[in-house]
Amino acid sequence: MRKLYCVLLLSAFEFTYMINFGRGQNYWEHPYQKSDVYHPINEHREHSKEYEYPLHQEHTYQQEDSGEDENTLQHAYPIDHEGAEPAPQEQNLFSSIEIVERSNYMGNPWTEYMAKYDIKEVHGSGIRVDLGEDAEVAGTQYRLPSGKCPVFGKGIIIENSNTTFLKPVATGNQDLKDGGFAFPPTNPLISPMTLDHMRDFYKNNEYVKNLDELTLCSRHAGNMNPDNDKNSNYKYPAVYDYNDKKCHILYIAAQENNGPRYCNKDESKRNSMFCFRPAKDKSFQNYTYLSKNVVDNWEKVCPRKNLENAKFGLWVDGNCEDIPHVNEFSANDLFECNKLVFELSASDQPKQYEQHLTDYEKIKEGFKNKNASMIKSAFLPTGAFKADRYKSRGKGYNWGNYNRKTQKCEIFNVKPTCLINNSSYIATTALSHPNEVEHNFPCSLYKDEIKKEIERESKRIKLNDNDDEGNKKIIAPRIFISDDIDSLKCPCDPEIVSNSTCNFFVCKCVEKRAEVTSNNEVVVKEEYKDEYADIPEHKPTYDKMKIIIASSAAVAVLATILMVYLYKRKGNAEKYDKMDEPQDYGKSNSRNDEMLDPEASFWGEEKRASHTTPVLMEKPYY
């Protein structure tokens, strides 16, 4: 038995070692490469300038009346580079002693930079209407905003009314339409509160005092307990006004209510429920809408400024290409384009309503009978009725490219994976500020990534190869655009990219191994799928480390459990008859205890609150 334990332990450690390091794999070997997957740059896989791309018409980016120079070279591929100019002079790209090979790994140098534009990941909730979470207050479930990023320039328009939504909600004998959305007056005053007042108020709170103004405003609103329910995890949203540096807590978390069945736009009917909708309006450009979940490092992980001289694109094997299928709208300026993107962005607004307007009937009845608690309970729900609690999770038309020359706003719902340097464009998102612009395009990104990849591969080659001839081998990454012509290691003359503020060069004589499909999806070409079948998708190194740690821990736990099981089995085996006659064994006395109680949940022995439908499964509508 001891020998068996030793064998199991050795097997577990060997398995862990294989997961972490592989059999005979060198430490410096690229994690996504096989040892013999490199091909010389002049092999048949890398075609010359005359190579005919068979999918020109199918995937060519179309744009009507672009207004741009017909000789402009777009970064899109496989579009023809008809207007591309040759380099000013022929370059001696390779030393006579250099052997240059091209890597087969199709990595994306923009992965880290573009992480903040993965809105589904970084925000995780609706933008136009954010009702991404549910919370209980005094025994009743309500919806509330839950986005992790600030929404710059967002406010609420009350239809046919001069009342601003930042006015305190109506209370007492006030008519319903006399109030707005903000917290009613309190003593001491908690809303609105100036930035200086908040800093002083939380000066002794180590967790809050050093936060930036937006996160501080979000946490301040989260400190208020609704309906004196200290056990509730409901948190109010807030709006921060950059103009006067004030934090407004919103008593009403609803963001949209339209239609004659649900509201009345008649200003004269003061006691009827008002209609309202979210918007990015000129009067709101200093406002920022905040949920309880705004992360304290939002400046690093969330988009704020629009990107000048840039358009969102898709990384397709070595270059950033245009997104072929977009929705195009006219827009006079960036503000209008950003507003359009916001209107089409992810929304958690209910798709259907109950036949009986329970919540709004409460409001009317509350005012009629002067029942303050009824009015409060009616205002607390966040604009959604019980019949429909749709959650977008941040999926929507959240991105746009604004063409300043044609005054067109191109809106799309696919996550961009790179930026195209184009002086005619500004890239924007539904979260971004409607006016603020970032002017610095990261021109050196390609050159820096190429240098880093070549150095990493050189270390691997130095450890694995014994080259006695003195030839220096270079493994060039699959990056075919750079502001440094020599870094491309191109087998033909690179071409100058027109309309680029970075003076980029592009190498277009190496065949692409990926393409964009009709639904804006990047896929490996059919002829290369077998070659890339076993190569995992690119993940950051910290993800790989997590996998290694998790796998090691799992193996250790399994080995421990197995040893304990075998030890107990050994003890039980001593009680068994040596002839192994099953009729003498009997049954375990604890068998009934080991059986699962069908009335118990895996959370514990108590029944769930709703035993028949513990979780509501909804069909997503994308």
Swiss-Prot record:
Localization per record: Membrane
Cross-referenced InterPro entries: Apmem_Ag1, Apmem_Ag1_dom_sf
Record key words, sorted: Disulfide bond, Glycoprotein, Malaria, Membrane, Signal, Transmembrane, Transmembrane helix
Range of residues in the leader sequence: 1-24
One matching Pfam family: AMA-1
Protein's UniProt name: Apical membrane antigen 1
Cystine pairs: 149-302, 217-247, 263-275, 320-418, 337-409, 443-502, 490-507, 492-509
One GO cellular component, as annotated: membrane
Family of the protein in this entry: Belongs to the apicomplexan parasites AMA1 family.
Gene designation: AMA-1
Cytoplasmic compartment spans: 568-622
